[in-house]
Amino acid sequence: ERLRRAGLFKQKSQSIRGLLIWLREVGGFEVLSKIGTEELRKQLLELKGIGPETADALLLYLFDRPVFISDEYARRLFRRLGFGNFDTYNEMHAVYGNVLEALTLKQCQEIHAVIDEHGKAFGKSKGQLDECWLR
């Protein structure tokens, strides 16, 4: 269930298998709960098939860490709101990666869900909007 919420259910089975093997090798959730979020993110990024967006989704949904996911939907929304014109995940993450630390885990998950729902409902890949309330 946690892998599905993190968005990994669509990934190749080898990436999921690698993640589970790594999780077992490092001692599981209890051991990982004792290390900082940035260190855990670095370790996740070292795994085959885990990029920045997937690492942050895992942090948010699998490891229960309050992080901001700077995905394409977030970049489009922030651009439209005038909060920055970010071309890449890493550019936006450098600016907004830690803004949610003062919020609860549930609030961080809800923010990500709302941004994704907005993007699915109103966003177009060309940077235009459908019938969006932001116009």
Report residues per predicted region.
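Catalytic cores of DNA base-excision repair glycosylases
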Residues: 1-135
